[in-house]
Amino acid sequence: MRIESGRMLNDYIQPNKKQYCIPVFQRDYAWTSEQCEKLFEDIVLAFKKDREHFCGSFVYAPLPTRKQIDRYIIIDGQQRFTTLYILIKALADSATDESDKAELEKYLYNEDKFNRYGLDDKSKLKLKPVKTDNDQLQLLMAGKLDKMNKGKDGIIYHNYMLFRELIATFLAEDHDDSIMMIRDGMDSLICADIRLD
């Protein structure tokens, strides 16, 4: 076991050729709108005050893999990780500048430009939740919002739409380059990095 300090965005989500899997024994994605709003406020505050914000622990372990990407199982921190992933998708979809959009999408997908790694569409995503959530996440990433669960169990859809609203409100405050300001605030999120080998 190794314990260090890690940055949620740059150490886990950004690197290419990594995929984080949420095991079946973990509960389905369940973050409430209040938790999402609090996380968004913390991210904005971290950017404005230019300081790090501790957001808990991230416990993970390597998985055997047949493809040339490193795969990990998330043992603790899956709710926060999934929420950040949804927020990045909302940021990318809110970006009006194509270079900002492309940069944000690098956080969502493993690049395989020349099909060297043999990644299928599901392996290209850097997050693989439990089956029920995975189906909804696949629809979100494909931009098929009309096919997503919008009922009370449609938490991924509802939190994505909430983040779109929060981002729109933030943009309306006339911030220059504000999409990337939110990304920079996300980079200030640190956690206790606990890797089990």
Can you name each region flagged by the protein language model?
Residues 1-197:
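Glycine- and hydrophobic-rich flexible loops that cap the catalytic core of alpha/beta enzyme folds
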